[in-house]
């Protein structure tokens, strides 16, 4: 967002498909680091980051991030690299898990220059030049960045440290304006996240423009709290005697992983982290949440070349030892066929060699190098991840189900609590905030349209609705 020739960036993520393309390219060895060449086709990133086309990069003052998930932070290294070309060294304000994760991303993408990171969880560490003099809303972390006063409002999500951002604009006469960026959120009144009284106060004090997510806008009611995950696991797995327990899960969903840690302990098993990505993310999260993630774990890698002391190749795990572990493999929802979980299923339960299954067939390299598990009727495969919402993801899910059917393992696709609000969550947020303007983000145009139909249509007065039609569309808030 831009004001008075100053710009702050509210989150900067990559789509999962683009993310995986870039990771594969980053891991290739054909780089000329002396020329600063990172990716052979940087237009892939530029196309996904319209800010690089529509904003004068010299005006960027900072990145302000809501939480550490890839679709909110993974473009930051690339945008930061472009800023540096313009002589701009923008700091990053975010949570400690996001700091740990981003440092790893910079390393993964082989971008050597790091920005200055500022944690939004400890105001005492904030440099004086960024300390806001806003006495209101004492419970919120605040930073003064150029003309903006940015406040981090705690919300519930599928990670333990997630925030909405309230950005106060300079007062003009009697007019006080605020941009409220929801980030990914749901309401959890049990924990008081978000603090609705503070949001109500913000709405009463300011004329608000709301930038709102739309992932749960098709679903009636409210999303369940994270504690339900532990209850569902205990109810389902306690008396279920299975040899192998393989879980497909996103590696950054701390509450879910914590629930599986608790369950593993009750079953007398160790957590088995499958793959480099799951391991790196887990260990970063463990560092960020030392009082939460603390179970005993073992690392398994998908390739023999990554074996080192204390790390075992998955292919060397013997069936007689399956009962020792509860295996967690990276799935990143249903988007692609190249996650560690998909590699396991491709080799453990190959599908018929035909065009119908071509996308999910293992390559020769996967068949020879990937650690192959023996999966059968005495085992269970659990999907603890978001339901598919695009056609490609639905096809991917269909192939996954065929793999599991081919393996004859028990399949449980429903051990998941969404990290996103539903229609009632959105309505309660907007009733408290009373925005003048609403701009949707996330997903397809249909879902953004549903936000207007299912939520805004019930508000009095009805806010103005601006639905961006293409990436890079700008909205000028003047009235």
What are these regions (language model features)?
Residues 10, 156-163, 168-229, 336-376, ...:
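Active-site-proximal loop/helix segments of hydrolase catalytic cores
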Residues 115-136, 271-283, 294-309, 386-387, ...:
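A generic structural motif
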Residues 411-479:
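Internal alpha/beta domain cores that form substrate/cofactor-binding pockets in large enzymes
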């Amino acid at each position: 967002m831009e004001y008075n020739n100053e710009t702050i960036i509210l989150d900067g993520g990559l789509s999962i498909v683009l993310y995986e393309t870039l990771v594969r390219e980053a891991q290739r060895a054909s780089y000329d680091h002396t020329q600063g060449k990172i990716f052979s086709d940087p237009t892939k990133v530029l196309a996904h980051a319209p800010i690089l086309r529509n904003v004068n990069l010299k005006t960027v003052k900072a990145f302000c991030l809501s939480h550490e998930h890839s679709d909110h932070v993974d473009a930051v290294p690339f945008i930061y690299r472009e800023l540096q070309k313009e002589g701009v060294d923008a700091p990053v304000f975010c949570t400690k898990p996001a700091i740990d994760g981003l440092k790893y991303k910079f390393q993964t993408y082989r971008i050597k220059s790091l920005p200055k990171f500022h944690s939004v969880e400890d105001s005492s560490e904030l440099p004086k030049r960024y300390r806001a003099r806003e006495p209101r809303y004492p419970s919120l972390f605040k930073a003064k960045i150029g003309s903006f006063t940015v406040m981090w409002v705690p919300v519930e999500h599928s990670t333990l440290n997630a925030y909405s951002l309230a950005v106060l604009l300079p007062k003009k006469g009697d007019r006080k304006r605020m941009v409220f960026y929801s980030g990914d959120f749901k309401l959890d009144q049990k924990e008081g996240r978000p603090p609705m009284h503070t949001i109500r106060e913000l709405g009463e004090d300011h004329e608000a423009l709301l930038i709102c997510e739309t992932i749960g806008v098709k679903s009636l009611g409210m999303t369940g709290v994270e504690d339900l995950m532990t209850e569902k696991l205990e109810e389902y797995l306690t008396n279920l005697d299975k040899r192998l327990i393989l879980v497909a899960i996103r590696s950054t969903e701390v509450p879910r992983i914590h629930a599986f840690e608790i369950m593993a302990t009750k079953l007398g098993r160790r957590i088995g982290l499958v793959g480099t990505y799951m391991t790196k993310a887990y260990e970063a999260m463990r560092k960020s949440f030392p009082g939460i993630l603390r179970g005993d774990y073992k690392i398994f890698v998908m390739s023999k070349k990554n074996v080192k002391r204390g790390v075992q190749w998955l292919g060397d795990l013997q069936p007689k030892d399956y009962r020792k572990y509860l295996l967690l493999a990276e799935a990143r929802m249903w988007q692609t066929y190249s996650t560690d979980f998909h590699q396991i299923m491709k080799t453990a339960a190959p599908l018929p060699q035909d065009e119908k299954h071509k996308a999910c067939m293992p390559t020769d390299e996967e068949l020879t190098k990937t650690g192959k598990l023996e999966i059968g009727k005495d085992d269970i495969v659990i999907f603890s991840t978001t339901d598919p919402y695009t056609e490609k993801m639905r096809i991917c899910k269909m192939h996954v189900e065929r793999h599991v059917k081919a393996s004859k393992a028990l399949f449980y696709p429903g051990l998941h609590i969404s990290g996103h609000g539903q229609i009632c969550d959105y309505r309660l947020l907007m009733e408290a905030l009373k925005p003048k303007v609403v701009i949707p983000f996330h997903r397809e145009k249909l879902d953004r349209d549903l936000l207007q139909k299912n939520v805004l249509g019930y508000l009095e007065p009805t806010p103005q609705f601006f639905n961006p039609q293409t990436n890079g569309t700008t909205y000028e808030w003047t009235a």
